Amino acid sequence: MTVLTAAEPPNRIEVDMDAPSLDTDSSCTSLSSSVQRYEYKHGRRYHGYHAGSYPFPNDKREQDRLDMIHHVYTRILNDRLFLAPLDPRGKAILDIGTGTGIWALHMGDAHPAARLIVGNDLSPIQPSWAPANVRFVVDDVEKDWVDRHPYDFIHCRYMAGSIKDWPRLIRQCYAHLRPGGWLELQESVNVMYSEDGTLPPDSFMARMMHGLIVACEKSGRTMDPAPSMEKWVQEAGFDPITKHRFKIPVGSWPKDPRLKECGSLMRVNFVEGVEAFTASLFTEVLGWTPEEVAVLNTGVREEAMRNDIHAIFDFVVIVAQKPY
């Protein structure tokens, strides 16, 4: 078993002392009716196909947030869509939980010589237009896969809180890869921290993340798969395995321009996305009242706008090959 650890990120993210805090006011073509049916609750739209499998909304506001997160993750990877040592030409590629389809669409644009790029998701929210080598499928990846064709590359990103049985999913990835094919898992470690003590453990942001982890565990889904991904791919038989770790700040406080850009977008993610995170899980699973959730959401938004709080997520990428 060959496990490689890529270069770690810098020890500390340097703070831009001149960065101001901000005020919260400033900133398939044929689908069955069951797939197209949606649920509406908490003032938001949720998927109806296998309802409850994904605890977050799928409406336009959420789609915009997901596209923003795609940009953050791509920038953190130095404008790369993937880290696997793969030449996409002539290859069949699968994007698990494609969401809006933005990763698959960008792959199709960037690699027109790729033979096929498939994006699957529970929600049919992908655009009807796409590059010629891209197609979208509505499917539940936790069930037996309908598509029996082998892939050369499987990409799975930002699926925290969505999967009940990660080891089974990874075994299915292994089974549907050609020998020599690659699996890439990208997830943030959903425990926030600061390197300078500016994020207290009882902060609203830390409490929200802890609540999400507890609620997902009660629902039978893990909100923090990143720490276990390396073990799961080892157990599935992948070899070699490379682990990359990056830092994602929340806020515009970093000096580094790229991290400042990513942090500014992550601030928007919290300010505008906190309602999507908490609406269903905190009321339906944790039993909070709407008033209690509203207080938490307000606290999260206010903390996210402060540049004297230097919150960070770690971002983990696992690149694993199926042996020949």
Curated annotation (Swiss-Prot):
Disruption phenotype: Abolishes the production of most pyranterreones, but accumulates pyranterreone 5. Its EC number is 2.1.1.-. Belongs to the methyltransferase superfamily. LaeA methyltransferase family. It comes from the Eukaryota. Induction: Expression is positively regulated by the cluster-specific transcription factor pytR. One of its GO terms (biological process) is methylation. InterPro entries: SAM-dependent_MTases_sf. It comes from Aspergillus terreus (strain NIH 2624 / FGSC A1156). The keyword Transferase applies. Pfam families: Methyltransf_23. Keywords: Methyltransferase, S-adenosyl-L-methionine, Transferase. Methyltransferase; part of the gene cluster that mediates the biosynthesis of pyranterreones, a family of antioxidative compounds. The first step of pyranonigrins biosynthesis is performed by the hybrid PKS-NRPS synthetase pytA that condenses 4 malonyl-CoA units ato the acetyl starter unit by the modular PKS of pytA. The acyl chain is then connected to an L-serine through the amide bond by the modular NRPS of pytA. A tetramic acid is formed and released from the PKS-NRPS pytA to give pyranterreone 5 with the help of the thioesterase pytI. This is Methyltransferase pytC. Pathway: Secondary metabolite biosynthesis. One of its GO terms (molecular function) is methyltransferase activity. SUPFAM superfamilies: S-adenosyl-L-methionine-dependent methyltransferases. Gene3D superfamilies: Vaccinia Virus protein VP39 (3.40.50.150). The gene is pytC.
